[in-house]
Amino acid sequence: MNTVRSEKDSMGAIDVPADKLWGAQTQRSLEHFRISTEKMPTSLIHALALTKRAAAKVNEDLGLLSEEKASAIRQAADEVLAGQHDDEFPLAIWQTGSGTQSNMNMNEVLANRASELLGGVRGMERKVHPNDDVNKSQSSNDVFPTAMHVAALLALRKQLIPQLKTLTQTLSEKSRAFADIVKIGRTHLQDATPLTLGQEISGWVAMLEHNLKHIEYSLPHVAELALGGTAVGTGLNTHPEYARRVADELAVITCAPFVTAPNKFEALATCDALVQAHGALKGLAASLMKIANDVRWLASGPRCGIGEISIPENEPGSSIMPGKVNPTQCEALTMLCCQVMGNDVAINMGGASGNFELNVFRPMVIHNFLQSVRLLADGMESFNKHCAVGIEPNRERINQLLNESLMLVTALNTHIGYDKAAEIAKKAHKEGLTLKAAALALGYLSEAEFDSWVRPEQMVGSMKAGR
């Protein structure tokens, strides 16, 4: 039995594994770009299949493709979407910057599979042509940007945003639950005036709410599709109604608000929509890193740290120190946030580096974008499930630190003035006294006045979180 078959493209014949659906151009890419291990993301492959499916339907409706061929292409695309042919898409991220080889990989797989569905022999009887039929009314230059936007928008809507909302809700519930717990605040890693634990967590909630708004603001641009621009944005070789119809078809089959890009030149020449959307993801990463750092600092200890909150103990933390448990969810979240920030630099460079009518950094851009979405979505889910939901206050420790803080002296500013209040704090710190003892020793106020004026619960403003 032959292990290879001969496939042809415009450069001639080349041997292809006999059991594979791909053709000559895919094989050439495999042989010429043996670079690292990163492959085109499955979600991007499926977005390409969705794009080809929609194009086949619209080309049929416009009388440009026979019903027989269009139906076979759609059936083949549905098989790809069902995961039946995942191993037919082996190409590296590090290929042509337009994604042409991955577009042709999809064209060849769908053409060979559609030909089989129409009774042809794999690679022998080409009843459906990869360029003339599967790629009809298209160019890699508008197909690949379209697939990028489809994959990105679906990932944001289905993966990231739900997890962001869930984590925000969890922290909002914690903020309300801890609204009456007065604790010491900290600025510059030094003691500051009091606030409630609920107020502190409300800041985290507001950060995430703003992040959601920024991400949602970026979505309409991502929903604009380049399809119909063909090679340079002019729409050469397309029907006048094709661009609008194919965007409408993609909107229907994905249940997402896709529209045809109003300016195809921008859609082909730039990656601005993804640069801007990833900027919002970078902002989310910055917020999550701050939250995770705050959580692990507040939970530090158990005996020699801050220890104001407890977090779930999920696994042993040391191979040498018995009983040690570490804030592993916080550490995982901070690491992936660093990766997202690095991805943002690469995406910015790629987005800024397109020349004239086409950006040619697209595979790298979408690889990093989808990785960031997956990291953030999975990271938030894990952090929420294994850490955030289990945050609990250590009231005894909170009260101990609150009552030992010298910064409660700030409450005296309006009664005895800043200079005398500072003198009290310095004396207490230098001599190891309580604030009350130092104040009485200096004779600046009576015991009754101190007890009336220095009341932490009255120093937090409204007890409502967010005040």
From Swiss-Prot:
UniProt-annotated location(s): Cytoplasm
Pfam families on file: FumaraseC_C, Lyase_1
EC class (word): lyase
Protein's UniProt name: Fumarate hydratase class II
GO cellular component terms, A-Z: cytoplasm
Quaternary organization: Homotetramer.
Transmembrane segments: none
More info: There are 2 substrate-binding sites: the catalytic A site, and the non-catalytic B site that may play a role in the transfer of substrate or product between the active site and the solvent. Alternatively, the B site may bind allosteric effectors.
Entry's family note: Belongs to the class-II fumarase/aspartase family. Fumarase subfamily.
Recorded GO MF terms: fumarate hydratase activity
Catalytic activity: (S)-malate = fumarate + H2O
Active site, UniProt feature: H188 (proton donor/acceptor), S318
Protein's job: Involved in the TCA cycle. Catalyzes the stereospecific interconversion of fumarate to L-malate.
Assigned EC number: 4.2.1.2
Pathway: Carbohydrate metabolism; tricarboxylic acid cycle; (S)-malate from fumarate: step 1/1
HAMAP family in alphabetical order: FumaraseC
One GO process term, biological-process aspect: fumarate metabolic process
Highest taxon listed in the record's lineage: Bacteria
UniProt-annotated site: Important for catalytic activity, residues: E331
Keywords linked to the UniProt accession: Cytoplasm, Lyase, Tricarboxylic acid cycle
